[in-house]
Amino acid sequence: MNQDTQSANTQQEKKIAYNFNKLQKRLRRNVGNAIADFNMIEDGDKVMVCLSGGKDSYTLLDILLNLKLSAPIHFDIVAVNLDQKQPGFPEHTLPEYLESIGVEYKIVEENTYGIVKEKIPEGKTTCSLCSRLRRGILYRTATELGATKIALGHHRDDMLETLFLNMFYGGKLKSMPPKLISDDGKQIVIRPLAYCKEKDIEKYSQAKQFPIIPCNLCGSQPNLQRQVVKEMLQTWDRQYPGRIETMFSAMQNITLSHLCDPSLFDFKGLKLGQVLDGVEGDIAFDKAEIPNQPLIQDEDEQTTDYGENGMIQFKQVQ
């Protein structure tokens, strides 16, 4: 190898390392902001990270472990995988990976695959029943482990897809919450990747070479409605840069008095002479001030924060 080739290789290696560090910093910042904005993790928490073997949950675990090293609070992490006894599931993959990084983990074995195959006709989407079964098992496991928070790997794009799915097919203005409490009040579920782009997670997963487990082992048909919405958003992202960022920002800037749900705003109770603090009544007659350009964020030069006041409260990233 001549000197010019060595120099070119060195430059390429430096560029790859630089881009990876920038990507990791961006993910850490977004996760830290989400944790701070929604008070996802508190001092003394035991966080149960649900690990499926896909890119999202691997990235979630990796970033949380990274933040834990220098967070201003103490919290513990335990990774949990549900082995649903799907044919061809590589049982050795996750234990080997988790042991290699030295994280506490538990593999829960439940034959939900058999239950789903028995209940759902061949060729139909099994995701709904499978999800309900998984939820119950994971709630039970969290209680057994003494976990105070259950962390899932849903990201910004998942939340937007769910918003449009509910609007298009369910007639509801509803998405995935970044933090929720179970119906019985015993479990708190958090989504620390709420501010993270799927494209960033894909790049990070490839760079880290996580041992990905395919998500189609169950043989279920894909959710066609979700796939349609996903492709729609991807098309918008290509054709109208910044639209995705603007839509996600809209989910955090809601004016209830300008929607139509009487259970959330007392339209019937409005009377002459009232002055309502924080209600933008007068602007109903004004022309809406809409920026000429959406919130544009280059995927490799992201500077805009979704976090509250743009501040990183959970973890200052250098």
Curated annotation (Swiss-Prot):
It is an enzyme of class 2 (transferase). Keywords: 4Fe-4S, ATP-binding, Cytoplasm, Iron, Iron-sulfur, Magnesium, Metal-binding, Nucleotide-binding, RNA-binding, Transferase, tRNA processing, tRNA-binding. It is found in: Cytoplasm. GO terms for biological process: tRNA thio-modification. Its EC number is 2.8.1.-. GO terms for cellular component: cytoplasm. Pathway: tRNA modification. [4Fe-4S] cluster binds at C127, C130, C218. The keyword Phosphoprotein does not apply. Its cofactor is Mg(2+); [4Fe-4S] cluster. Binds 1 [4Fe-4S] cluster per subunit. The cluster is chelated by three Cys residues, the fourth Fe has a free coordination site that may bind a sulfur atom transferred from the persulfide of IscS. A motif (PP-loop motif) lies at residues 52-57. Its main location: cytoplasm. It catalyses: cytidine(32) in tRNA + S-sulfanyl-L-cysteinyl-[cysteine desulfurase] + AH2 + ATP = 2-thiocytidine(32) in tRNA + L-cysteinyl-[cysteine desulfurase] + A + AMP + diphosphate + H(+). GO terms for molecular function: 4 iron, 4 sulfur cluster binding; ATP binding; magnesium ion binding; sulfurtransferase activity; tRNA binding. The thiolation reaction likely consists of two steps: a first activation step by ATP to form an adenylated intermediate of the target base of tRNA, and a second nucleophilic substitution step of the sulfur (S) atom supplied by the hydrosulfide attached to the Fe-S cluster. Catalyzes the ATP-dependent 2-thiolation of cytidine in position 32 of tRNA, to form 2-thiocytidine (s(2)C32). The sulfur atoms are provided by the cysteine/cysteine desulfurase (IscS) system. Homodimer. PANTHER family: AMINOTRAN_5 DOMAIN-CONTAINING PROTEIN, SULFURTRANSFERASE-RELATED. HAMAP family: TtcA. Belongs to the TtcA family. This is tRNA-cytidine(32) 2-sulfurtransferase. It comes from Actinobacillus pleuropneumoniae serotype 7 (strain AP76).
